[in-house]
Amino acid sequence: MVKKEINILEELQYINENTPLEKVNDPLLSERKISLFIKREDLNHPHMSGNKWHKLKYNLQKTINKGKNTLLTFGGAYSNHIYAVAAAGKIFNFRTIGIIRGEEHLPLNPTLSFAVENGMKIYYLDRKSYRKKESSEIIKQLQEKFGDFYLLPEGGTNELAVKGCSEIISKIDIDFDYICCPCGTGGTLAGLISGLNGNKFALGFAVLKGASFLKDNVNSLLKNFTYSSFLNWDVNLDYHFGGYSRTNSILLDFVNRFSSITKILVEPIYTGKMLFGIYDLAEKGCFEEGSQIIAVHTGGLQGLKGLTSRTIR
């Protein structure tokens, strides 16, 4: 059973909420007089790394406050979110259920193997049903099967996730012009925008193809959390490389070069696409000379294990 009287932040001793900012020393940027800093959120926890901890922490606290002992959430077979929720369940003694898009494939990939090893119950939902996963019909079926649970949306994105991600801004102690992050559901970007409170500029890089919906998602999250709208942000849709989890030799070569130069490991699904976009926009002169840019490393390095178990397209 879940411990009822618990403060998430006090209990978890191994979270580093003061992750470093590391400057990128790269002639491709310096010759354009652009300064790039990486906010190393990948270093905040071994298994709930990057934006996942920020999205989870207030949702975990609410789960406890409501007296729930089961977390149910959704994700793909290689989901960083599924991985992080399973880890959280193990750490905080929650029962966790992962509703996975698609059919079962054995043996389990590294992401799902980790989830199961950490106590998560895996349940597969065919793709047609998955598209309406948060409908009252599907939720009722899941409640009948698994009993009472705290529902955490796919990707962990809701108003509490926005609250957690907004706190990233308060940990930045240098002046800057832009802050960037990769975008899957828009929760991290909404959090950054909220934390900026109308100052500076936040730029998200969509990792999905056809992600024009992200702007509406972000606006909705902002209105629900801050009751305000902001103009100091945008979502770039040009660097998805064909869609979620898609990549090619150009992106992989860039990621390998970046990691070699900086000694900062990144994956090509989220952070790698954002960084490619930043470099390309810098080359095209889209950032003013002298600009200081912060790129949020959203973790997800567990996904690198999965890349060796599937074909890169």
Whereabouts are the PLM-identified features?
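PLP-dependent amino-acid enzyme catalytic core
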Residues: 1-313
